[in-house]
Amino acid sequence: MPGQPTNSRLSEGDFNYESRDVGYTTHRRPDPRIAAQIHASLGEARSVLNVGAGAGSYEPTDRYVVAVEPSASMRSKRPRHLSPAVVGFAESLPFDDGAFDAAMLILTVHQWPDQAAGLREVRRVTRGPIVVLTFDWRAADRFWLAEYSPEHVKVDSSRFPEIDSLAQWLGGHARVEEVPIPLDCTDGVAEAYYGRPERMLDPAVRAAQSVWGFVEPAAISRFTERLGADLASGAWDRRFGHLRTQPEFRGAMRLVIADR
């Protein structure tokens, strides 16, 4: 049921990837420009821990990476050139103190049952930077979706931790970077379609965005009906048509980089 978190620890937290075909390999392919920003934030680290690793998106291939992922479904989607993932959870990592040079947490913290405990545990096993890809929903109104589906924003803003809380849980020393999203972004988060609104009418595209699993069907219908009507009438283009050719979009996506 939409809005109902999973009661199983088969997955990392609030979204059960075992029971849903989310189409990640088709619609959530790592974007090389976002990858470059993430990898640069890892600094000179040679060993990297990837917690809530999913299918391995954005894992660098030129460093030693240990991935941790509880979902069997997501582990099965890891490409062959990546190492198999360790089965585990953020709140209880099976590693010694300071075992890794750096850690990366890619759009995962919002799904953890105990975000504070998980981040403290990641800090325990990491002696260098922790790089968190997340969203700052205080900037949600930059994106037209906030007008077409306020329910989407309400749900996601309740799931994602505040940036200040992230920094505090990671030790208090963090910097925040905006992540520009390119017009042809291959990683199908909602903001990736800022200039391609028709794609958001595709149920398969929305299925690859976990938030829609928590939005009531009636609200989804209102969203698709209104967006579809505005696209057909030209109302969307009259207000937002400039986005169709805008090279990049600076919305709510953020990198939080916490050093020791």
Regions found by a protein language model. Give the residues of each.
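Class I SAM-dependent methyltransferase SAM/SAH-binding core
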Residues: 47-93
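Local beta-strand N-terminus motif with an aromatic residue
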Residues: 45, 100-101, 127
